[in-house]
Structures are given as structure tokens and as C-alpha cells.
Amino acid sequence: MLFRSSTAISLIKEAGGVSIIAHPLASQRGRTIPIDSLDAMIEDGLDGIEIHHRDHSADEVEQLTRFARERKIIMTGSSDYHGTGKLNQLAEFTTNPDQWAALRERAVRERVITR
């Protein structure tokens, strides 16, 4: 089942989560997310974007950092580590402490979904 980004963002927030889009300019993975689409997602309530990731070039990191600062959204980093067998190393990219604090501040501490 596919969701519109606005629906996904709403569901994340309803569940007490923080909505972060992962590696939006990672061109090595194929399609990227256009900047105007990111702006539309921010209008729908997107909380932040993953900036620091092995598939983002230095120029892309700079572009995304500028973009996020201008829009005052959270900037995260991630190793995207899902286990052995990939180049990704655990904790190779992380989220800056001030951004981590902003992320935690937006998260709802109570469990919203109890299945």
C-alpha cells in the first residue's frame, strides 16, 4: 500500500513520532527527492531530513544543511547500518547533539499505539 507523504507524516505524528526523510539526495540509490517536494513535505509537517549519510556527497551535505537551516527543520545523520554485508559501518555518521535534543523534544514520550 502506498501513502501520500502527507498521510505518512500525519500517521507518524499521530503515533507520537518525529518525521524525518532519509537521505533525500542519495543519487547512488537511483531517484532522488526534488527540493520542491521536500518543501511540500515541510508544509505537511515534516520535522527534518537526514543530511549526514554515506550516499550524500560533500556538495549535497552542504546543500541540504543550508536548506534545513533556512527552514528551521531538524538535521540528522545515520550510518544506515542494517547488519553485515554492506559498506555501511555502525555509527559512521551520527546526529549532532543539539539536533538530537531537538528531535527528542518533538517526540511524544507516551506510547500512543498499544496493540
Question: Language-model segments: which ranges?
Answer:
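Charged catalytic cores and adjacent phosphate/nucleic-acid-binding surfaces used
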Residues: I9-I21, L25-R115
